[in-house]
Amino acid sequence: MEVLDVLNLGEIAQYFSKMAMFPVFDVAYYIVSILYLKYEPGAVEVSRRSPVASWLCAMLYCFGSYILADIMLGVCPIDYFHNNSHILLASAVWYLIFFCPLNLFYKCVAFMPVKLVLVALKEVVRTRKIAAGVHHAHHAYHHGWLIMVITGYVKGSGVALMSNFEQLLRGVWKPETNEVLNMSFPTKASLYGAILFTLQEAHVLPVSKSTLICLFTLFMVSSKVFMTARHSHGSPFALIESWVCHVLFGSPLGTEDAHDHHHAAPAAAPAPLSPAKNKEELSEGTRKRKSKKAE
């Protein structure tokens, strides 16, 4: 405790939890979100063919979590759009990423060192949104733990949960990409973070809110930056989830490996044909050499 007092970690966490997100952190959030939109197949073509549809998709990527959370809590779903500064800022980012001459802005923000910084700033915003969602639900439903968890979860990963609707705006329908069925790391982390913040709001978790925000932000930033740098789509929770599902639900261990193996098996089937093919090629080469000698 004396070491903590000397380092003033409590004061640092308090300052960090009250730090304003606008405009620096919010700009980073918008840039990374719309950058991921541009990575989607056909997104660039849609922006040229129908800029309005592309802009709507970008707004869903930036504000989808607020829209979905407001719908759940009975608030007008377009309530957040009264923040003109945020809408203009997100629209400017969308225009620069998709329509900047020579793609200069996109190349700058997609440059890996810059992208890692932006990803780190985005995770700061994600943690703050999860905490705000749980706090908002706590005021409306003091003892509704499940509602707090769901609201925080939606605030942290609402964009991914609305991905199917966003795809419809681009003329794409991929029901197999349902985020609830195949959760990505940010979605899982948002769920676990919402549970932690709910326990803190219920005074079950013996830690201050500012400290929890600081610690969870450090975890999210370090994990997401590491995964982005390595181009990894895995999850740090995979091993724990595998054992928990095996114990509680009887799921087989190593399901993903077996799944990949089964899918890879048909591709490996033609392998035995290669020796015959090599023999045919060798015999053909031999015949050519003999014919040359005969000539």
Swiss-Prot record:
GO terms for biological process: regulation of release of sequestered calcium ion into cytosol. It is a multi-pass membrane protein. It catalyses: K(+)(in) = K(+)(out). GO terms for molecular function: identical protein binding; metal ion binding; potassium channel activity. Channel activity is activated by a change of voltage within the sarcoplasmic reticulum lumen and blocked by luminal high Ca(2+) levels. Residues 38-51, 107-144, 200-210, 256-295 are cytoplasmic. The chain crosses the membrane at residues 19-37, 52-75, 87-106, 145-162, 183-199, 211-227, 237-255. InterPro entries: TRIC_channel. Residues 259-295 are annotated as: Disordered. The keyword Transmembrane applies. Ca(2+) binds at residue 74. Residues 1-18, 76-86, 163-182, 228-236 are lumenal. Keywords: Calcium, Ion channel, Ion transport, Membrane, Metal-binding, Nucleus, Potassium, Potassium channel, Potassium transport, Sarcoplasmic reticulum, Transmembrane, Transmembrane helix, Transport. Residues 277-286 have a biased composition (Basic and acidic residues). One of its GO terms (cellular component) is sarcoplasmic reticulum membrane. A 1,2-diacyl-sn-glycero-3-phospho-(1D-myo-inositol-4,5-bisphosphate) binds at residues 122, 126. It is found in: Sarcoplasmic reticulum membrane; Nucleus membrane. Residues 265-276 have a biased composition (Low complexity). Homotrimer; conformation seems to be controled by binding to diacylglycerol (DAG). Intracellular monovalent cation channel required for maintenance of rapid intracellular calcium release. Acts as a potassium counter-ion channel that functions in synchronization with calcium release from intracellular stores. Opened by a change of voltage within the sarcoplasmic reticulum lumen. Belongs to the TMEM38 family. This is Trimeric intracellular cation channel type A. The lineage of its organism: Eukaryota, Metazoa, Chordata, Craniata, Vertebrata.
